Amino acid sequence: MQIQTILLCFSFSFSAAFYFHAGEREEKCIIEDIPSDTLITGTFKVQQWDIVRHDFLESAPGLGMFVTVTTYNDEVLLSKLYGAQGTFYFTSHSSGEHIICLESNSTQFVSFGGSKLRIHLDIRVGEHDLDAAIVQAKDKVNEVTFKLQHLIEQVEQILKEQDYQRDREENFRITSEDTNRNVLWWAFAQILIFISVGIFQMKHLKDFFIAKKLV
């Protein structure tokens, strides 16, 4: 039976590195709130529990991780099987929450290593792998060019985040105004109902007193 766990939910950030534990065939997910047209880079590494040493090994040989990325509209942006460590990429098509899930692809490790895994995950928003690019640079000019390009991308990402936050604030303001307007109209409708009921009761009592010749 497949188990799915939502680990955490956090808003837009440039980088989030952490680790978590997972069991046999247990799918664990995180939720990222991402602006549209944004590159996401995820790097992961799996460590296997050693029941003899009572510690995690440096790797998990023979094990793989199945990575899926979906939106809340059930649009699949990524669905791929990787090894015990790897890097995945995807680009958001629209603003909003994106669900990133990881699941081990085998249960063979249970018989010799226990059912516990430690998964290290580093999520980077709007960033390319600058270090790898610099290593491949042939001279200082190329290195400076890569760094400058990286800086430009960061500035563009900050501007994109600001636009996204402004859009969220505008949507929240519109929702709040609509809610306040609905509350005001409902209060006005209640007042009209109370006045109508009062007039009806007064007329009913007046007719009753006249019929009984009390007035």
From Swiss-Prot:
A motif (COPI vesicle coat-binding) lies at residues 208-215. Its main location: endoplasmic reticulum. Residues 27-125 form the GOLD domain. One of its GO terms (cellular component) is endoplasmic reticulum membrane. A motif (COPII vesicle coat-binding) lies at residues 208-209. Residues 18-167 are lumenal. Residues 1-17 form the signal peptide. It comes from the Eukaryota. Keywords: Coiled coil, Endoplasmic reticulum, Glycoprotein, Membrane, Signal, Transmembrane, Transmembrane helix. It is found in: Endoplasmic reticulum membrane. The chain crosses the membrane at residues 168-185. Glycans are attached at N105. InterPro entries: Emp24-like, GOLD_dom. It is a single-pass type I membrane protein. Residues 186-215 are cytoplasmic. Residues 136-171 form a coiled coil. Part of a complex whose function is to bind Ca(2+) to the ER membrane and thereby regulate the retention of ER resident proteins. Belongs to the EMP24/GP25L family. PANTHER family: TRANSMEMBRANE EMP24 DOMAIN-CONTAINING PROTEIN. This is Transmembrane emp24 domain-containing protein 11.
